[in-house]
UniProtKB/Swiss-Prot annotation:
PANTHER family: CHLORIDE CHANNEL PROTEIN CLC-E (PTHR43427), CHLORIDE TRANSPORTER (PTHR43427:SF12). The gene is eriC. SUPFAM superfamilies: Clc chloride channel. Belongs to the chloride channel (TC 2.A.49) family. This is Chloride/fluoride channel protein. It comes from the Bacteria. Keywords: Cell membrane, Chloride, Chloride channel, Ion channel, Ion transport, Membrane, Transmembrane, Transmembrane helix, Transport. The chain crosses the membrane at residues 23-43, 57-77, 97-117, 160-180, 188-208, 222-242, 264-284, 315-337, 344-364, 386-408. Gene3D superfamilies: Clc chloride channel. It is found in: Cell membrane. It comes from Pseudomonas syringae pv. tomato (strain ATCC BAA-871 / DC3000). CDD domains: ClC_sycA_like. Transports chloride and fluoride with similar efficiency.
Length: 452
């Protein structure tokens, strides 16, 4: 009898139905919230950018705007000041619900930063809004610890997908950004649903994403592969430089200026003076280095550009983010990668549009440690033809950038290289770990010498 019953055991696929129904509903709700928030943000950003471009004198108010944003965070925003790192930390080690105030504060702070001329991006804002809004559902539905982790990841995916119009890359980003070398497949279905629906919600609100055309893509041959590997190494080192410079400047400014609202005030003053000083230079169009810089990114696919444009954007972005202006790192990284690829193309005998497109994603891959998301992003933005060469560059960039990144809270799930690192160590703790290891090695050598 028992043998007969085993023959009629319920198929395990039926057990998926409650799971699918649950996460279709939850991820769909996350997507509705995150997609709507991203739409409001992007439409506001468009208006802010248009107004700033027609009123160039407003750059002189950037220090005042920076002080205002810094003061708001100083008075009521300290619990959410960590931004993306707070979301990542809560996924790894859930403690308390992300405060809802993160949403209006980062939205207004980023729009104000763009309105007055800071060089910041938009991904960080969308991810923070998506994560914070998703986490409010933890209260509403009394989600368990593991479900809370998954819904936060879905919020990240929804925010990323809706702000860039790349649903598949957004889904992978939410899975991949948490830890180097490891992904959580238990969140794959919710992240994919949230990303796809959030992108559609944004479009339903009237959001139109930039369309990029890269032109000719060379065939995959030995010479093109070698050239792209070389470019990928440069892209990875550039991502490393960006992340390191931003973190080091931020730490230096915190030591130098103890009152936090004065940090973006000082940064805004420095940027305004630099724009004024360089504005009379006939060789440098400094206006390209403030704001998002989307027109320059589009131009990098169409014609040769000044070989120093990537460096100019990096300097203005590092100063903006390092002194406390709100916004993301990713769009500036797109700009840096695209213009650097444009500059490298003649040296490597590759079409500048193609290498600009590869640089667009590869610098981001190295700086964020998300090679899979960026490979898929290349296909979503530029077409499938670029996939093989983009994959080579993104992987090279990811490996060369080492265990650094723009997200301090990112963990090491699996080391990139053979040099051992403790599992789950935060990127911000690696330097201290190496210092302790070297100190322990020196003590061993000293003790061995004394014993002899």
């Amino acid at each position: 009898m028992a043998g007969q019953m085993s023959k009629f055991r319920r198929p395990e696929q039926l057990d998926l139905l409650p799971y699918i129904a649950k996460w279709l509903a939850l991820a769909g709700l996350v997507a509705l919230l995150a997609g709507s928030a991203s739409a409001l943000f992007l439409l506001s950003l468009d208006h802010a950018t248009q107004w700033r471009e027609t009123h160039p004198w407003v750059i002189w108010l950037l220090p005042v705007a920076g002080f205002a944003v810094g003061l708001a965070y100083h008075l009521i925003g300290k619990p959410v000041d960590a931004g993306n790192n707070l979301i990542i930390d809560e996924i790894h080690d859930p403690k308390k619900i992300v405060p809802l105030r993160m949403v209006p504060m980062v939205l207004i702070g980023t729009v104000v930063s763009h309105l007055f001329g800071a060089s910041v991006g938009r991904e960080g804002t969308a991810v923070q809004m998506g994560g914070a809004l998703a986490d409010q559902l933890t209260h509403v539905f009394r989600l368990r610890r593991e479900d809370r982790r998954v819904i936060l990841m879905a919020g990240i995916s929804a925010g990323f997908a809706s702000v860039f119009g790349t649903p598949l890359a957004g889904a992978l980003f939410g899975l991949e950004v948490l830890a180097i070398g490891r992904m959580r497949y238990d969140a794959l279905f919710p992240c994919v649903v949230a990303a796809i629906v959030a992108d559609q919600v944004g479009q339903a609100w009237g959001v139109v994403h930039t369309h990029y055309v890269i032109g000719e893509v060379v065939p995959v041959q030995l010479w093109s592969v070698m050239a792209v590997v070389a470019a990928g190494i440069v892209f990875g080192l550039t991502g490393l430089l960006f992340a390191t410079a931003t973190h080091k400047l931020g730490a230096f400014v915190k030591r130098l200026i103890t009152y936090s609202p004065l940090r973006p005030f000082a940064g805004g003053l420095l940027i305004a003076v630099a724009v004024w000083a360089l504005g009379s230079n006939h060789y440098i169009d400094v206006d390209k280095y403030i704001g998002l810089g989307i027109p320059s990114i589009v131009q990098s696919f169409q014609m040769p550009m000044a070989p120093w444009d990537w460096l100019g954007k990096m300097v203005f972005t590092v100063v903006s983010l390092g002194t406390g202006f709100k916004g993301g790192e990713v769009t500036p990284l797109f700009y840096i990668g695209a213009t650097l690829g444009n500059a490298l193309a003649p040296l490597l005998h590759l079409p500048f549009g193609m290498l600009a497109g590869i640089g667009f994603v590869a610098v981001f891959a190295g700086a964020a440690n998300t090679p899979l998301a960026t490979i898929v992003m290349a296909m979503e933005l530029f077409g499938p033809e670029i996939a093989p060469l983009a994959a080579i560059a993104c992987i090279a960039s990811y490996l060369v950038s080492g265990h650094t990144g723009i997200y301090h809270a990112q963990r090491v799930g699996h080391s990139k290289h053979h040099r051992p690192l403790p599992e789950e160590i935060r990127l911000s703790d690696i330097k201290q770990f190496h210092a302790q290891s070297e100190s322990a090695s020196e003590r061993k050598v000293t003790l061995a010498g004394e014993e002899k």
